[in-house]
Amino acid sequence: MLSCFCWETVTDWEPCFLRDWELQVHFRIHGQGKKNLHGDGLAIWYTKDRMQPGPVFGNMDKFVGLGVFVDTYPNEEKQQEAQKRRYSPGVQRVFPYVSAMVNNGSLSYDHERDGRPTELGGCTAIVRNLHYDTFLVIRYVKRHLTIMMDIDGKHEWRDCIEVPGVRLPRGYYFGTSSITGDLSDNHDVISLKLFELTVERTPEEEKLHRDVFLPSVDNMKLPEMTAPLPPLSGLALFLIVFFSLVFSVFAIVIGIILYNKWQDQSRKRFY
């Protein structure tokens, strides 16, 4: 399995603290593989951590942030062929397929189902082996996530995904990654261009759009992360052991007193 990464910020190698932004991605996917004999696609990220190699298009699973996936290989379709199709044809997706996922670190990306269980939305995007430029834009304005494509050679954006109520913290990193397995393809990221968008907000919107510290989507329940308990200090451990011993001694003394009292009462019955 081969992975390729381009993990960096678009603004001077620092985290992105823009409130409203637009990321334009100029990319190209091409190769010699015929239908469904190529893979696996590329991902564009806005995440808390820099690149950590893993199974999700080359990045770590259970990431924290936003992932946008240009998936070129239909894993679920192959599963369905083997299992007599678990879904009706009406819900089949045509690949290549673009989807988005917001994660707070608690969710796993399901490769066998091409991310369907955690998908915010998606669209078909025929992007392989085209003879003109292909672009993808991710726009985040007033907690509104919009993804558009320019893949027809007409220099026109067409809607792909639109999700309101997306809450993304500031200070995360932009990056791209790709991965191949038994099949392969060429995934070229030609440019990443980040733009700050100037947006006016009413006082009410200012209150509603305060900074958040964990990614989430309104009306979508994400499992809460449970923080591990901090290790006990030496003093705390000593106090626990000390009071446990005191309690044990106290219990033994009470037990002896009650036993002696019971014996005295037993003797009185015989005299």
Protein language model features and the residues they cover:
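Polar, low-complexity loop segments and adjacent catalytic/binding residues used for recognizing
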Residues: M1-Y271
